[in-house]
Amino acid sequence: MVSMFWLLATFAYLLGSLSFAILLSRLSGSPDPRASGSGNAGATNMLRLAGKKLAVLTLLGDLCKGLIPVVLAGAWGLDPSQQGWIGVCAVLGHLFPLYFRFRGGKGVATAAGVLLGLYPPAAALAIAAWLLTLYLTRTSSLAALIATPLTLPLLAWQEPHALLPMSVLTLLIVWRHRGNLRDLLAGRERHF
């Protein structure tokens, strides 16, 4: 199973490196999301820059980048910890995409896909918390910063073997939002 783990981890990183925001912006003639709007290659910035249709396609593509490798790992009999680490590889691909000079997004939708494949109730909790926080604050980054760590107690209770990789995933997302944290504290963060 070790060789299958490494094969799937590599596949997850390479799949995660496909940036749907960048690809769709190029295909549609929209601005590069890394250089426009919030500067993030993700669905929220695509909504600002290119509209709902491309934002939804970006969201679905990014979600599948996390979901597919985790589901494959489960189908091949890898344990929840290994599935979690494979999911982390998919998110690392999104954050640091090989194909786009290692300049990617913040990993929230890809992480949601990982959770969906690993433990769907945790994904449902994260999505509900994200939507509620976005509705109340109109701030996508704050929604991500609240929703992502909120899943950890549920995972500790129901999928304890996946807790370490999912904690690493949470730290990666919080780290990737460090600029947003500064802007939130200074009152400069973008709202919808």
UniProtKB/Swiss-Prot annotation:
Record flagged with keyword Signal: no
Q: Which InterPro entries match?
A: G3P_acylTferase_PlsY
Reactions catalysed according to its record? an acyl phosphate + sn-glycerol 3-phosphate = a 1-acyl-sn-glycero-3-phosphate + phosphate
Which pathway or pathways does this protein act in? Answer: Lipid metabolism; phospholipid metabolism
Q: Name the UniProt key words of this record, in alphabetical order.
A: Cell inner membrane, Cell membrane, Lipid biosynthesis, Lipid metabolism, Membrane, Phospholipid biosynthesis, Phospholipid metabolism, Transferase, Transmembrane, Transmembrane helix
Q: What topology does it adopt in the membrane?
A: Multi-pass membrane protein
Q: What does this protein do?
A: Catalyzes the transfer of an acyl group from acyl-phosphate (acyl-PO(4)) to glycerol-3-phosphate (G3P) to form lysophosphatidic acid (LPA). This enzyme utilizes acyl-phosphate as fatty acyl donor, but not acyl-CoA or acyl-ACP.
State the family it belongs to: Belongs to the PlsY family.
- PANTHER family named among the record's database cross-references: GLYCEROL-3-PHOSPHATE ACYLTRANSFERASE-RELATED, INNER MEMBRANE PROTEIN YGIH
The name of this protein is Glycerol-3-phosphate acyltransferase
**Species whose genome carries this gene:** Pseudomonas syringae pv. tomato (strain ATCC BAA-871 / DC3000)
